[in-house]
């Protein structure tokens, strides 16, 4: 069995969402792939293909492990353990899980959540148990909480339900209709500009010290109001850029991110950083008439470029 799960971007509202305002997230087709197969050994074998790492655990060990002691395997192991517990299954046959991912790590695209959700789906499917989306999302959220100490529903819910979500106060609603149809026809670039210099928690703490942050968040919320009504790429791109300018006022951008956003504005419809900031990724709304020039300019920078579209 092979499971493919998306990653996610924040289109609007990062940081504001911490303070009870809205964020708009989108599942994208930068995916991770989880393959699960039965084996003849009494073992659970995990292969992280991109890191060229493997781990084997005896079947009776899995229930008693602390996943946090297993480094790069921790999300996958926690997802296996919690799914088996939830389904009340004592594994009797061994299985092997192969994990591959196109998603750059530690840059706000939900790489760990993608692997977590994929593993939950793979393990439940392996035992012919069909979990509902709300069960999968809840299990995924609990894995992230167990590993990270605290978590937001944004990554696990967006990756489970796909499409477009409006997140507020750790709850969400799925956005359908004209807005979803409009975004289906948009082509984006994710540009991994630079390694993040600070962790999300540090950036959130720094934003907390900004005196006029509430005014900035209210402006971001107005941008979301406008964006949800728009049906043309030019205006949507301008709102992405406006959101970026507001994020700059929170001091979470960097000169490199600003440079990539500027290229995205000149040769695309618009651009913004996505995620916590302090480095990481920029999302650009592609103007296909200028795409060659856009790629030419981006390739002068030391960046990684990923084509993506909404995944539903």
Swiss-Prot record:
BP GO annotations: isopentenyl diphosphate biosynthetic process, mevalonate pathway
Tell me a Gene Ontology molecular-function term this record carries.
Answer: ATP binding
E.C. no: 2.7.1.36
What cofactor does this one take? Mg(2+)
Q: Thermal profile, per the record?
A: Optimum temperature is 70-75 degrees Celsius. Highly thermostable. Retains 100% of its activity after 24 hours of incubation at 70 degrees Celsius. At 90 and 100 degrees Celsius, the enzyme shows a half-life of 15 and 5 minutes, respectively.
Listed under catalytic activity are: (R)-mevalonate + ATP = (R)-5-phosphomevalonate + ADP + H(+)
**Can you supply one Gene Ontology CC term for this chain's record?**
cytosol
Keyword terms, alphabetized? ATP-binding, Cytoplasm, Isoprene biosynthesis, Kinase, Lipid biosynthesis, Lipid metabolism, Magnesium, Nucleotide-binding, Transferase
Summarize the activity regulation: Farnesyl- and geranyl-pyrophosphates are competitive inhibitors. Slightly inhibited by high concentration of ATP.
Q: Where is the active site?
A: 155 (proton acceptor)
- Compartment(s): Cytoplasm
- pH curve summary: Optimum pH is 8.0-8.5. Exhibits at least 60% of its optimal activity over a rather broad pH range, from 5 to 7.
What pathway is this protein a component of? Isoprenoid biosynthesis; isopentenyl diphosphate biosynthesis via mevalonate pathway; isopentenyl diphosphate from (R)-mevalonate: step 1/3
Binding sites annotated in the UniProt record for ATP: 104-114
Q: Which domain of life is it from?
A: Archaea
The record's PANTHER family line, in alphabetical order, gives: MEVALONATE KINASE (PTHR43290:SF2)
* Oligomer and partners: Homodimer.
Its annotated function is as follows:
Catalyzes the phosphorylation of (R)-mevalonate (MVA) to (R)-mevalonate 5-phosphate (MVAP). Functions in the mevalonate (MVA) pathway leading to isopentenyl diphosphate (IPP), a key precursor for the biosynthesis of isoprenoid compounds such as archaeal membrane lipids.
Q: What family does the entry list?
A: Belongs to the GHMP kinase family. Mevalonate kinase subfamily.
Q: What is this protein called?
A: Mevalonate kinase
The species is Methanocaldococcus jannaschii (strain ATCC 43067 / DSM 2661 / JAL-1 / JCM 10045 / NBRC 100440)
Q: Which gene encodes it?
A: mvk
């Amino acid at each position: 069995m092979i499971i493919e799960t998306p990653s996610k971007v924040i289109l609007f509202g990062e940081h504001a969402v911490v303070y009870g305002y809205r964020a708009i997230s989108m599942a994208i087709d930068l995916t991770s792939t989880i393959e699960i197969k039965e084996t003849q050994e009494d073992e659970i074998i995990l292969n992280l293909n991109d890191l060229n790492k493997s781990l084997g655990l005896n079947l009776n060990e899995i229930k008693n492990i602390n996943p946090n002691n297993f480094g790069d395997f921790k999300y996958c192991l926690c997802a296996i353990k919690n799914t088996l517990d939830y389904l009340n299954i004592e594994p009797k046959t061994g299985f092997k899980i192969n994990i591959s991912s196109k998603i750059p790590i530690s840059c706000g695209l939900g790489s760990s959540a993608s692997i977590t959700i994929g593993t939950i789906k793979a393990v439940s499917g392996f035992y012919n148990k069909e979990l509902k989306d709300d069960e999968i999302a809840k299990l995924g959220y609990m894995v992230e909480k167990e590993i990270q100490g605290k978590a937001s529903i944004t990554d696990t819910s967006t990756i489970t339900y796909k499409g477009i979500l409006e997140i507020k106060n750790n709850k969400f609603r799925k956005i359908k209709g004209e807005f979803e149809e409009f975004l289906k026809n948009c082509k984006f670039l994710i540009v991994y500009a630079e390694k993040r210099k600070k962790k999300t928690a540090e950036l959130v703490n720094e934003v907390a010290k900004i005196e006029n942050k509430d005014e900035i968040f209210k402006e971001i919320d107005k941008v979301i109001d406008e964006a949800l009504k728009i049906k043309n790429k030019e205006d949507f791109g301008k709102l992405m850029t406006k959101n970026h300018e507001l994020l700059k006022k929170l001091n979470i951008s960097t000169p490199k991110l600003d440079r990539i956003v500027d290229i995205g504005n000149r040769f695309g419809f618009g651009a913004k950083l996505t995620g916590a900031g302090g480095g990481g990724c920029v999302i650009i709304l592609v103007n296909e008439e200028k795409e060659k020039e856009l790629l030419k300019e981006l390739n002068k920078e030391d960046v990684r470029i990923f084509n993506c579209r909404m995944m539903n």
